[in-house]
Amino acid sequence: MAAAAATPRLEAPEPMPSYAQMLQRSWASALAAAQGCGDCGWGLARRGLAEHAHLAAPELLLAVLCALGWTALRWAATTHIFRPLAKRCRLQPRDAARLPESAWKLLFYLACWSYCAYLLLGTSYPFFHDPPSVFYDWRSGMAVPWDIAVAYLLQGSFYCHSIYATVYMDSWRKDSVVMLVHHVVTLLLIASSYAFRYHNVGLLVFFLHDVSDVQLEFTKLNIYFKARGGAYHRLHGLVANLGCLSFCFCWFWFRLYWFPLKVLYATCHCSLQSVPDIPYYFFFNILLLLLMVMNIYWFLYIVAFAAKVLTGQMRELEDLREYDTLEAQTAKPCKAEKPLRNGLVKDKLF
């Protein structure tokens, strides 16, 4: 795998479009692509897969081994670090049970987002400031730069682990089924975009999605720690409130503003300008649009959360996502537990 960055262009980056421009140009490009595809069908799909998909068996094996490694590492961290920490800090039982999951996800998303931010903002890759450049010089079977390949290995193996973890390790929640769909779609996007060498746009998607998960898990940890050892800790409560506001803002800005205007505009419209016969155009854009739909779905939880706060129905941060079915049927919280109704709105991302 090569380490060379994308070839720089002398032209000034194209200004980011408005929502209306993005929708109009993307629809026109997609319609033209559909009308010009005379041989679209399973035959073309099979030929495109055979000619343009490059994913070696050793790469798949390495991803599976890393997924097993994530699972083992999470178990070890939960057993030897997170649970003893919760016990030492004298967290409420419900909070102590949820701390390992949030702590684990915070560490992963913080590390991966920091790495992706470094690649996009600290190196010569122009993809964040010039999203159409993700398709400049694209070639079928081109070498993947080693630093982007590392990001793909981390993310792909983690989402493979996350499918297992959602079913067998995480608390079951209202949107866990949607979360499973999200993980499957994300893993399919990661594997296929790597195979078809759309890794540049994948790096941008990683960056735009992981930042909100960092804030979510950090905020949830402060919610768990704000009432511990029989006392209320105002600092953690303040940080949780500020983190909630920051999370809501970043969710909209990164996933509902930048994601469609940078990523979807580049994949739906600009891709055909750079590579008129780009393979699997509709397949990838349908998956990315499905990801956008799920982002909007979770944003509805955020709106419901904000509405409860603004109307005074909620005096403490309450989890609109987290719930345990058995606990909901049997548990009756005591007075000391009421200020600890915790959580936020959503749990991750591509």
Curated annotation (Swiss-Prot):
Subcellular location, record wording: Endoplasmic reticulum membrane
SMART domains, per the entry: TLC (SM00724)
InterPro entries attached to this UniProt entry: Lag1/Lac1-like, TLC-dom
Statement: the UniProt record of this protein carries the keyword Lipid biosynthesis: yes
PROSITE patterns: TLC
Modified residues (N-acetylalanine): A2
Gene Ontology process terms (BP): brain development; cellular response to dithiothreitol; cellular response to mycotoxin; cellular response to UV-A; cellular response to xenobiotic stimulus; ceramide biosynthetic process; negative regulation of cardiac muscle hypertrophy; negative regulation of D-glucose import
Documented EC number(s): 2.3.1.299
Tissue expression profile of the protein: Expressed in brain, skeletal muscle, heart and perigonadal white adipose tissue.
Result, substituting H183D: Decreased ceramide synthase activity
Pathway membership: Lipid metabolism; sphingolipid metabolism
Residue ranges of domain TLC in the record: 97-311
Note: This protein is produced by a bicistronic gene which also produces the GDF1 protein from a non-overlapping reading frame.
Name of this chain's protein: Ceramide synthase 1
Organism: Mus musculus (Mouse)
